[in-house]
Amino acid sequence: MDLLSGTYIFAVLLACVVFHSGAQEKNYTIREEMPENVLIGDLLKDLNLSLIPNKSLTTAMQFKLVYKTGDVPLIRIEEDTGEIFTTGARIDREKLCAGIPRDEHCFYEVEVAILPDEIFRLVKIRFLIEDINDNAPLFPATVINISIPENSAINSKYTLPAAVDPDVGTNGVQNYELIKSQNIFGLDVIETPEGDKMPQLIVQKELDREEKDTYVMKVKVEDGGFPQRSSTAILQVSVTDTNDNHPVFKETEIEVSIPENAPVGTSVTQLHATDADIGENAKIHFSFSNLVSNIARRLFHLNATTGLITIKEPLDREETPNHKLLVLASDGGLMPARAMVLVNVTDVNDNVPSIDIRYIVNPVNDTVVLSENIPLNTKIALITVTDKDADHNGRVTCFTDHEIPFRLRPVFSNQFLLETAAYLDYESTKEYAIKLLAADAGKPPLNQSAMLFIKVKDENDNAPVFTQSFVTVSIPENNSPGIQLTKVSATDADSGPNAEINYLLGPDAPPEFSLDRRTGMLTVVKKLDREKEDKYLFTILAKDNGVPPLTSNVTVFVSIIDQNDNSPVFTHNEYNFYVPENLPRHGTVGLITVTDPDYGDNSAVTLSILDENDDFTIDSQTGVIRPNISFDREKQESYTFYVKAEDGGRVSRSSSAKVTINVVDVNDNKPVFIVPPSNYSYELVLPSTNPGTVVFQVMAVDNDTGMNAEVRYSIVGGNTRDLFAIDQETGNITLMEKCDVTDLGLHRVLVKANDLGQPDSLFSVVIVNLFVNESVTNATLINELVRKSTEAPVTPNTEIADVSSPTSDYVKILVAAVAGTITVVVVIFITAVVRCRQAPHLKAAQKNKQNSEWATPNPENRQMIMMKKRKKKKKHSPKNLLLNFVTIEETKADDVDSDGNRVTLDLPIDLEEQTMGKYNWVTTPTTFKPDSPDLARHYKSASPQPAFQIQPETPLNSKHHIIQELPLDNTFVACDSISKCSSSSSDPYSVSDCGYPVTTFEVPVSVHTRPPMKEVVRSCTPMKESTTMEIWIHPQPQRKSEGKVAGKSQRRVTFHLPEGSQESSSDGGLGDHDAGSLTSTSHGLPLGYPQEEYFDRATPSNRTEGDGNSDPESTFIPGLKKAAEITVQPTVEEASDNCTQECLIYGHSDACWMPASLDHSSSSQAQASALCHSPPLSQASTQHHSPPVTQTIALCHSPPVTQTIALCHSPPPIQVSALHHSPPLVQATALHHSPPSAQASALCYSPPLAQAAAISHSSPLPQVIALHRSQAQSSVSLQQGWVQGADGLCSVDQGVQGSATSQFYTVSERLHPSDDSIKVIPLTTFTPRQQARPSRGDSPVMEEHPL
């Protein structure tokens, strides 16, 4: 094992030594003309690569021959073994080394890349090509003529033209032989300094011209190769007369240098020769020897007379760096003089470097395809740069032009490897066009560039891409068919078959053209005539062979030029544009395109509108049509006119086109109700109508068209009990349930009709008045309902808003956020102000409590209360609220279950304001039995006295006794000051809120009347203790207006007096309003209902959400701190001026406190549901404590900012909704104000301003009442705004978080709910955890707080 490990390490080290340089050279010798598949060498062995184990490589070792694209290599190499073989290509030394001097070796070089990258090396292999005798020596001519004078001496030598053999060495010319010389001439061979063998003819005998003047013989030349090769030429010798002297050159060897850029005609050298003869024999003739090459003869000119050598053609040092010119000077004799002129052509930097790219990675269509996951340093190509110039002009550097993930690494002189320098990413770059730059060191330097394209391989998800996005071609008319116009080309980022591109003509291509599918050459196949067509615009498609194939196209524009003999041509004979009717003036309607087949000014077209149509304008150059009018499709649906096009020729030509502009409908019309025509249409619905019956049909029309005119109907308000439903398409209003007694009355259903327009739907609303009754004979009732329907607007179920753009939503959200922030700041400010202003008044209230004449408390109780107060002050606990519960229940004389009246006194113990805040005072119902007088309308207990023990021996007629004998016409019902004890009209089952979930003790008092009747007693609250006492009540006559007979019923009275409370809240707004207290209006529901909140419906019973009855859609939320409806009561001194002694003893009632009949026309006598207290008014219905502040009721007015929700009027008051007590009245149901301010919990008006539905402020701006309820763990905020509308003051609910249904009230309905003469409210009380019986359409079941 150790031996193997050592061998492996040695092999690796050896490989590192072998390949440390990154490049190697290896020489082999071969002979020319070698046959194919001859083994030359083995690189694996010769380079010792067999020592490297294959297991150490990621891939097997590979030998790759690197050669220039297009070259035919003379050898091949086995990629797996590294063996080198010859190919079928001929190895011709004379051809490969034609420009090399004969005395130099001939080499053939190739590069071999050894892969993989771990052992990559580039090996340069040099093959020395040995010459073989494959060429015979040849004379320059087949006949050689020479002249010899007759007096030539024996052994005289005359030079003959030498033969030439391309072979070298022994394979070259070795011997000359003279055949058939007749022993007169002989042949000698001499060797020149250059190594050439020159034949010389020797005269062996005397010559006699008169005897023989011509000799003909043969000359043979032989080489020394094997087999030996030879050739012959005819030698013809002429004998001439005697010429004693021969010419002599002044210089026999001349060497000159001349730059290769010397112009033609430049003198190279001047030869000088002399002859001793005279006359004709002294004339010297200069000529080139036959040994001068043809190239030299082509480049240089020799003046035969003067001997001047000049440049005949431009020289090129890179082709032939030097030239040997053998010049002969002859005087006509047989012995010419010889002079050798060596012309050296000096180098000039006139050649740019050349870049030779030899790919290691085989390219595809001259593009190297690389996978994006190839490793770093992957070898791509071998770059060889050369320069034919010499010295510094031939020194070349190579580099790339910009930052790319590839680099050039030098390996040999002027050779570089292109390899990856960073990881490739197909998603970032799909292909690279690498520009290689080569520059020499000349002055100025010359450079050359070459492009190398690399594609990153990926999946076939790319369509072919044309190199040009738009091809423009011009061709003259009357062309010959078959002319090639242009060649289009496209590339595809994919690879393989997916990158193979076929070129096709598009479907719009005319038949005059054809396209080569493979090359993309576009050809004209027909003769073109510009008069028929001046230009062609079509597409050429490039489609790959993928599945499915992907295509791309390029637009080709072929233009033909001719004279102005064509009129402008519209692209269409008629134009139809469609524009929305809300297109602004000068907006863009459309574009008219005109073409003119002519050229230049003749094709300059000017557009105009005919018939002086001023409604539209057209740009004379661009053809853009713009309107000068505003469109209205409902007025005109289309416009038609003609556009004229005129060219700019001398004799202008014109044409016209019809333009029709169609106005497209935009949803700019709201649906308009046809049925009912107004908000004052009434429909009678009989109570016996079966469910599912269509009771009414609404109909609305929309002036728009299409979906903008499609109308859908929905009920959005007034249908609180879900008694009706509407078909959204037909508008049919259907009765959903059987009507019962509680459903009788006028139902004001708010119906919305909205269209289906996009993007914004428009809508309209209408009030459908459905009168559920047996008949319409009761004119008084109908008139009253109609009157109230005009005063009590309808509450929408949800906010109806015309949805606009998302931007408007953002604006609304921003406005709401700002308004909320301002509201919070205002509330905090008001709270601080109220607390500051209450401090002195609370002290005064405590002082006044000591002088209270309302009830004399038991000393024990007083002492106990004071101790509790001290204890609570130490604990910093919230102060208790004083809650007074007064409940009177009356039974009819004919009630078989009645066994007499029993008076029950419930005293709540330790009721804290937190407990009170958690109780749902609004939604907990209390029910009176039928036909009992409405007592809650005028009596409320607001006593500030502490809890006390009831003394049974107290005289019955005592003013301060808890049981009062009341006349039957006195409608007396009182509850705690926080809960709602409202009166209702003729509805026998209307509901009132009277309940409190606290622990109390009950003192039942049985009341006996004549005759005794059985009654059922239900306690409002659980009692700890019970004591029964019997009290007789003498019924009093009722008012005439009520039409009742005295003595037929008794009433049950129950007082609830909380123990130890120092605070109370007044009436929750119960009691009917005087009909005359509202300013009557003749108009209906204002259309601005989204800004106002209304009542859901008005019924004969006037049971609304604002009169204190149980709200069928409100949901009790445990922990919700409910604010009290606050009523400020006047002092007894103020009331005693209008009341009888009986009122002062038994309490105020309709008989004594209010007039017998109501004057509806006397608006100046309008009164509120509460009276203003005169000082001392020491306590408010909500007392500000240290945190947590449990309740805040504030009405934002001009200072002082301490008003609450009720209205204050000067006497004579018409209705009282609370119990009035004898002075000192030290506790009120409103926030305390310093005297003589009459703005306690109500806004005070001095007559004759008597509109109860309106609140007077220091400014006409609407004020905001913010009702804030907070809890330790949850925050519920109700913000109620009051605005002065046409129908009265209306509240706007800003949202109640955590409430199932928003509550909507108006001041008029809140404070003056009804004026009906019959007021019967059945009353019921609840024990803890008892649930109220929900009415139809209730919210989830209301529960009392577990406390």
UniProtKB/Swiss-Prot annotation:
Stretches that traverse the bilayer: 813-833
Extracellular side: 24-812
Glycosylation sites: 27, 48, 54, 344, 553, 773
Region feature Disordered, mapped onto this chain: 1057-1091, 1097-1116, 1325-1347
Hydrolase listed as a keyword: no
Pfam families linked: Cadherin, Cadherin_2, Protocadherin
Record GO biological process: homophilic cell adhesion via plasma membrane adhesion molecules
Domain of life per record: Eukaryota
Subcellular locations according to the entry: Cell membrane
GO CC field: plasma membrane
Topological domain ranges for the Cytoplasmic compartment: 834-1347
InterPro entries: Cadherin-like_dom (IPR002126), Cadherin-like_sf (IPR015919), Cadherin_CS (IPR020894), Cadherin_N (IPR013164), Protocadherin (IPR013585), Protocadherin/Cadherin-CA (IPR050174)
Entry keyword Acyltransferase: no
One Gene Ontology molecular-function label: calcium ion binding
Alphabetical UniProt keywords: Calcium, Cell adhesion, Cell membrane, Glycoprotein, Membrane, Repeat, Signal, Transmembrane, Transmembrane helix
Membrane topology term: Single-pass type I membrane protein
Cadherin domain span: 26-139, 140-249, 250-355, 362-466, 467-570, 571-673, 677-795
SMART domains associated with the record: CA (SM00112)
SUPFAM superfamilies, per database record: Cadherin-like
Signal peptide segment: 1-23
Function text: Potential calcium-dependent cell-adhesion protein.
UniProt protein name: Protocadherin-11 X-linked
Organism from which the protein derives: Pan paniscus (Pygmy chimpanzee)
